[in-house]
From Swiss-Prot:
Essential for the control of the cell cycle at the G1/S (start) transition. In association with cdk-2, regulates proliferation, quiescent state and cell fate during the development of several cell lineages. In the embryo, initiates the establishment of cell polarity through the recruitment of the centrosomal proteins spd-2 and spd-5 during prophase. During the development of the vulva, controls the onset of vulval cell terminal differentiation by controlling the duration of G1 phase. During hypoderm development at early larval stages, controls syncytial fate of seam cell daughter cells. Residues 108-119 have a biased composition (Low complexity). It comes from the Eukaryota. Residues 155-192 have a biased composition (Acidic residues). One of its GO terms (cellular component) is nucleus. Gene3D superfamilies: Cyclin-like. The gene is cye-1. Keywords: Cell cycle, Cell division, Cyclin, Cytoplasm, Cytoskeleton, Meiosis, Mitosis, Nucleus. Residues 1-193 are annotated as: Disordered. It is found in: Nucleus; Cytoplasm, Cytoskeleton, Microtubule organizing center, Centrosome, Centriole. It comes from Caenorhabditis briggsae. Residues 47-62 have a biased composition (Polar residues). This is G1/S-specific cyclin-E.
Length: 518
């Protein structure tokens, strides 16, 4: 906008550049001096009438509107940052005109009522504590204000912009930290939320229990390399085994079913595993699924669909354990056309929902394999070799096969539900392996702790020894399986042929007494 002339007593026109430089100067001392100069100059400006002031303001607004229209049609949108370039008519940019017009209106209204007495000290600035030198001349101050370059004003704007950028970056950093803190709180809250699955809630409580169980002495740090400490690994395994399995009352909701029918179902599932060349762990998982389903389901299972439950459990276990599980059509063919693939899939969904998707128990076969791995680790005879999780087994596969066949038979016996998988595997190892001290170091149990379980499994172990001597079973190790995995393939054994030997051993042990050492 065009500058205005005022009638002063001194006759010297006042340049607006002096006032603007005083306001926009980034230097503290210079800014304070120029402020004092501008106030002194303002005293000599006569009071204007309201009509003159309104006319000047109107002309400023018209100039601004015309310049904006001209700029919008010729040069595109207006830049966000104010420019400090002067125009040909001596006026500042449009963005400054509105700011300084408001300043003049405020200063003129205030100047008419109150004015500072010349020589009165200025109030101290909040950011400054140093006092100015009183010997400085007023003319020198005015000359400094006139000689202040325009680049200082531009630098002031840039410095102000840098300060604003720094403040905005600090605010963004604080917001990022606050967002991370909120995410951490949300993660902790999600971890503390209760689980909808009751079985998973029990598993979570057991796994997160701070009470640790001492690991067996044979479970060293070298064998747990890359997994965790022996104490924590063993504690997690033991707590996982504390999740209850099925009980002897699993058929109470199914009056049409009998214990003998369950044994027939288990024998048929074993035969299916033999035909499909499935692993022994698959067979044990399938029997566990079927038993838990029969105990937990509220719907009555009748004799017509009793085999369907075992087929669905076998289908789930194969998909959980096997690399190449059998197809549903293959299992349907094993039922001799009694059930279709749709029937098996529907029952599979029912069993999975009733088990609440808990498919990972540690079976007796897994516990026995763990114990034998600890027992089969030879002592380190050479100090140049470091102990690790790789070992050379000292036990023969024939010993392993003899013990796992006993576990297969115990799986079909209803009395085995009185004990956990872990204790049954340890008891079988106590009966079939010497010395006891080595078994105690591998299992973490003392012989006296498992007295009841040992008394239960001893007749069965002795019966299998006699049965093996008289009737050598065929295909103990199948020829169709790879040599390194042949002992893990399930082989069908007719348990009803072993029952007479078990009864004889139990009667003999009853006559001799259970406390006699074998």
């Amino acid at each position: 906008m065009a500058g205005r002339k005022s009638s002063r007593t001194t006759g010297e026109p006042v340049k607006k550049a002096e006032r603007k430089s005083a306001i926009l100067s980034p230097h503290d001392e210079l800014r304070e001096r120029l402020l004092e100069t501008s106030l002194d100059v303002k005293e000599n400006i006569p009071e204007r009438s309201s009509s003159t002031r309104n006319e000047s303001v109107g002309s400023q607004r018209s100039d601004c509107s015309e310049s904006r229209k001209r700029r919008s049609t010729e040069k595109g949108p207006v830049a966000k940052r104010p420019s400090t370039e002067k125009k040909g008519n001596g006026s500042r940019d449009d963005s400054f005109s509105s700011v300084f017009s408001e300043d003049r209106e405020t200063e003129s209204s205030v100047g008419s009522t109150s004015s500072r007495t010349r020589g009165q000290p200025l109030p101290a600035m909040p950011e400054e504590e140093e006092s100015l030198d009183g010997s400085s001349d007023h003319n020198a101050e005015s000359e400094e204000s006139r000689e202040t370059p325009q680049s200082d004003e531009h630098d002031g704007f840039e410095e102000d912009g840098d300060v604003e950028d720094d403040v905005s970056s600090d605010v963004n950093d604080e917001e990022d930290e606050y967002d991370e803190y909120e995410e951490d709180e949300e993660t902790e809250d999600e971890f503390d939320l209760p689980l909808q699955n009751d079985d998973f809630a029990v598993t979570k409580r057991l796994m997160n229990d701070r009470h640790m169980i001492d690991a067996p002495s044979l479970l060293s740090y070298g064998k747990c390399e890359g997994i965790g400490s022996p104490t924590k690994v063993w504690s997690l395994m033991v707590k996982r085994d504390d999740i209850p399995r099925a009980t002897r009352q699993l058929l109470r909701n199914h009056p049409d079913m009998t214990i003998n029918m369950r044994r027939v179902l288990v024998d048929w599932m074993m035969e299916c595993c033999d035909v499909e060349k499935l692993h022994r762990e698959t067979f044990h998982l399938a029997v566990d699924y079927a038993d838990r389903f029969l105990e937990s389901t509220r719907e009555e299972v009748i004799s017509e669909n009793f085999q369907l439950v075992g087929t669905a459990a076998l289908f789930i276990a194969a998909k959980y354990e096997e690399i190449y599980p059998p197809k549903c059509a293959d299992l349907a063919a094993l039922t001799d056309g009694a059930f279709s693939c749709d029937d098996i899939c529907r029952m599979e969904s029912i069993v999975a929902k009733d088990l609440k998707w808990s498919f990972g128990p540690i079976t007796s076969v897994q516990w026995l394999s763990t114990y034998l791995q600890l027992l089969g680790t030879g002592k380190k005879n050479n100090d140049h070799f470091e102990e690790g999780n790789m070992y050379i087994p000292e036990l023969l596969r024939s010993e392993y096969l003899r013990m796992v066949r006993i576990l297969d038979y115990l799986l079909s016996d209803i009395d085995s539900f009185n004990f956990s998988y872990r204790t049954i595997a340890a008891a079988v190892l106590f009966v079939n392996y010497d010395p006891r001290s080595a078994v105690e170091k591998a299992t973490g149990f003392i012989y006296e702790q498992l007295r009841n379980v040992i008394d239960y499994v001893t007749p069965i172990c002795r019966a299998y020894d006699r049965f093996t001597q008289e009737h050598v079973p065929k295909d103990i190790i199948p020829d169709y399986a790879p040599a390194e995995d042949a002992h893990n393939i399930q082989v069908h054994i007719k348990h009803y042929e072993v029952d007479p030997y078990v009864e004889k051993e139990r009667e003999r042990r009853h006559r001799r007494g259970p406390n006699r050492r074998l």
